[in-house]
Amino acid sequence: MRAILLAAGFGTRLRPMTDSTPKCLVPINGKPLLQIWLERLTADGIGPFLVNTHYLSEQVEQFIKESEFRDQVEIVYEPKLLGTGGTLIKNIEFFQGKDGLLIHADNYCLADFNAFIVAHENRPNICKMTMMTFLTDDPSSCGIVEIDEEGIVIGFREKVEQPPSNFANGAIYILSHDLIELVASKFNKILELDY
């Protein structure tokens, strides 16, 4: 399964640490976060990868160039940040019409990706995407997912005082090939725009 790793953000909440280091290269136990992602995903049989860059992009490009993953990673520089949806739309053909992962690579995650893929394969038929969630003790501090009794997302609430649950959006998604084709067909005009 192919994966797009979103790594273009400014990392403003981690300043001053990110004043000179992109958030995806901030070390955790001495290892850059992006390296942790690439190692974990590769170990689970996931790849190749597309990594978008913007802020301090030269550092990310240099890291990939010097890494063991250089042949598995396509780097796409965004002169203007496109956001999650914009990056997906602009690079939709990367998935080659198959199910694919979309990951905010500036987050740290210890989840079992094989189990996540199995959950996606066994999702209800009406679901076109599987979203990783996590339980939070402070639901008013993050984006909360509202789900029905079948585990289907029915709403989102962003940092509200009275959140409907404590399931937080983990910013990791598996997109079905059906959804990828739908996005490609509905937004093909946007794909032609010069960003």
Where are the regions a protein language model picked out?
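Active-site glycine-centered loops adjacent to acidic/histidine catalytic or metal-binding residues
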Residues: 9, 106, 135
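Short Gly/Pro-enriched turn/cap motifs at secondary-structure boundaries
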Residues: 16, 80, 134-136, 162-165
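Catalytic-core segments of class I nucleotidyltransferases/pyrophosphorylases
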Residues: 101, 108, 114-123, 137-139, ...
